[in-house]
């Protein structure tokens, strides 16, 4: 069970790192970007124009 939790945490960390990498690319665009976590525990990227 402990290994499963560790694997899940690793996947979440990799997903979050990917989101941060993407946000750095998007930050170069003059716009407002945000992240929201859904009820299904998924990250949603949005833009406010």
UniProtKB/Swiss-Prot annotation:
Upregulation details from the record are: Repressed by AbrB. Induced in stationary phase in LB (rich) medium; the transcript is present in log phase cells grown in modified competence (MC) and MM media.
Q: Which residues cross the membrane?
A: none
The gene name reads yydF
Organism (species): Bacillus subtilis (strain 168)
Superkingdom of this protein's organism: Bacteria
Reported function: Suggested to be the precursor for an exported, modified peptide that has antimicrobial and/or signaling properties. Synthesis requires YydG and YydH; the peptide is proposed to be exported by the YydIJ transporter. In the absence of the transporter, the modified peptide activates the LiaRS two-component regulatory system, possibly by eliciting cell envelope stress. This activation can occur in trans in cocultured cells lacking either the transporter or the whole operon.
The name this protein carries in UniProt is: Putative exported peptide YydF
Give the InterPro entries listed for this entry.
Answer: YydF-like (IPR023898)
